[in-house]
Each structure stands twice: as structure tokens, then as C-alpha cells.
Amino acid sequence: MELRKALIAGMFAVSGAAVAAQPATTAQPRRTPAPEVLLPAPAPAPIVAPPAPTTKSGAPVIGIPEVQPLPVNEPVMAWPVADARALLAVIDTIESEGLFSKDYQPEALRAAIAAGPGQALDAVASKSFAWLAEDLRDGRTPMESRVQWFAVDPDQDVTPTTGLMTKALATHNVAGTLAELAPTHPDYQALKAALATTPRADTATRSKIRINMDRWRWLRRDLGEIYLIANVPEYQLRLMKANHQLVKTFRTVVGKPGRTATPQLAEEVKAVVFNPTWTVPQSIVVGEGLGASLMRAPRKGYKVTRNSDGSLTVVQQPGPSNSLGVIKIDMPNPHAIYLHDTPAKQYFNQPIRAESHGCIRTQNALVLGMTMAIMGADMPQEQLVANATSGKYTKVPMTRTFPVYISYFTMGQDTGMTGRVVSYADIYRRDAPVLASFAKARELKTTQRISSEPVIQLDNPL
């Protein structure tokens, strides 16, 4: 046992991911070459989607709006000619941001400017500004084209269109106000640079760059002081710190295409569970006969309980063969998706790693979980090593939460974030509906905030 503790402690220290608990304003020198991780400020409260309805069988269905989405209410304000000209100049160059000038009625705005101040100019300029602000802030892609999209973006609440237009007109700085809406992540800037250097004749590549730039706009602009972001097609998870600096990457195994595809989420790490248990889904207990088999011949590592209705509950106990491995990073959500260790570590060596039932198996999950617990629960490394090696179920709640983004980018920087833009296989075929929406005229925005697809919670999320 002491040898195992020493090995885990050594692995954790060498990884460079361990961080001594300290005040956020002071950075202590480190002896390891890994980047220093600063303690985050408390994460902003997430915006929660409406409660999910259920199917007739009682299984929860996620992503069906309770009310019909309505068109957004766009303001109309008085526009001086000079500010309208500044808006037109932005529209004329907006293709550098991966959008289309024609979407924002430049010819109508040009004609209204020529006619001079008045209601016509106010109406046209207000509409053009609102549409442009919405697309720069929230993305051009309509919700119906965002497959399995359940990451509610709060930016329209933080920077509403009315406030943006008021600011632009009060400061007479239309271009500056709109520029503040662009994503700040380095991947967005790398894609923007790639778009600028890709020949116009290469329409397929330019279209792919555009939709992946737009995917960054789907996410909240402020991703957090410290956050985790998984890119499903890349099979990678990144731990990021202030100003989008890369701390460490982790290989992942994600959901198989089809019903068990991993959805796109924005959640928070709320706890780290050492030596987790796993409640075996009924599809295995009943469908594969595991419950009856264990009743006939009990097996070490499984606890079977007969319920009052005669059904069986099977719980796999903590241990080296537990399906969740030695650690689970809990990010509560209606989909039962989380990050976890796995005893099947051979999958991390495969180039294509879409093998799970939805959850994200994470290489070196113990290192990641300990890092989260040190930063989020102020626990000393020695205690965490003891938790990990005890073999006992131990849940460590976070006093500081960390955002987790489960994203889907088919183009972006390479894994090391060196600035080189690479493509990833569209394993779930989610590009097609976004590309189709970009090939059509811009759709009017509605109040819908997530995908309307019915998604039944997976009964076996591993």
C-alpha cells in the first residue's frame, strides 16, 4: 500500500498538474516545468434550461422547449448618418469574421444613408446592427441546425442587443462595440487567420472554417478563469487557465456515433469522487441477465439488492475493475454525462476513440481529478493520495466550481495549440446541417436557447 501511495504521488507530481492551494492573487514559484495554475474566482451562476419532460415510460427527454420559441424583440433607435456609415463599413468587411455581408442588408442601408436622417434610416440601421450583433455574439447558426446542442449561452443576457446599440450610439463607436463581441479563444483567431489565407476558389475549406468559427460564438465569450474544454472529434480534453493558456491535455474516449453520441454541453465540476461505485443499468441487469446470474452465483465486486417490486439493483463496488476506474469527475446534468477513469486503458492508444456510451473516459483522470480537488476544495495532495489509495468511496465536493465545455469542432488548432490549424473527422456528421444553414439566407433569431431534439437520458452512460 505504501509503495502504491508513493507511485501515485510521484505520478501526480511529475505530471506538473498538481497545484498548491494558495490565494488567487499570489503565484508561488514552482520547481516543475509545467505551467502554474492559478485559483479561479467563483464561476458565474449557470443559466439552466427548463426542466425536462419525460416519455410515457418515465425516461427523461432532454431538449424539448416547453413553449414555442418566439422571434426576438429587436430595438429601433435614432441613427445619425455618421454612425450609420460606420455600421456600413463594418458590414462591408464582416466576411473576415466568417460571416456574410449580404445578411445585413448593406444595399438597403446604403440607400437609407443617401436619403438622410429619418425613420427609414433608423429602421434599417437598427435592424442591420441588431442582426450583426446577434450573429457576432450568439452565432449565425439557427438552433435547429445545432445537433445535440445543450450548452446554454448567457451572452445575450450579459450583453443584450438593446444595451449594445445604446452604447454604440452614445459613444459613436459602432465598430468598437461590435468588435468586443468576438470570441477571445486562440482557436478562433487561428481560424480567422486561416480564412484570410485560404483562396476564395477553395470554397469547401472556407466553408468549414466559417462554421467552426461560428461554433466558438455558440459558447459563452467568458469561458472562465480556469476551465476544461473537450473537443469530441479530436478525442482530447484541455485544462486551460487565465487568458486561454494551455496547462495540460488529456486523451479521451467519447460516445459511439448514433444514440450514444456525446452531446454538446456547458456544465460545472461540482465534485470529485474517488473509488466510485457504478449502478449497473437495467439493460444489463435484466437485458443481459446479470442480475439473475449474480443471484445464483454471487461475484466479488458486485452488490445485489432485491427491491420491493421484485426487481434487482446491482451496484459494482469500488476496485481496480470498476467500470469508472478509480475516479469520477462529477458535473451534474440531465444527460448523465461525466468525465471518468477506466480500467480499459488500451483504448487511449487507438487513433479513433469513439467507443463509449456517451460519457468521456479520460486518460490520466486521477491526475485531473486531484488537480480539480486541490484547486476546488483546498485539499492537500497527501489527503488526496490517501483517498485514492484507500479503496473506499470518497466524494469531495467543490467549494469552487469549474466550467466544463463539451464541444464539437472539426477544425481548429493542433493538440498542442501551436497555431497550426488542422481538421478532425466529423465522426457524428454534425457539420452538414451547419453548412446547409450557411448556404441559405440568414434566419431570424428566436428565443430558443438549446436544441429541440428529444434526447433520452442514456441508461448506460459509460
Regions found by a protein language model. Give the residues of each.
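Positively charged, low-complexity intrinsically disordered regions
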Residues: K5, P23, P29-T32, K300, ...
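Sec-dependent N-terminal signal peptides
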Residues: M1-A24
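Peripheral peptide segments
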Residues: Q22-T25, P29-A34, Q457-L462
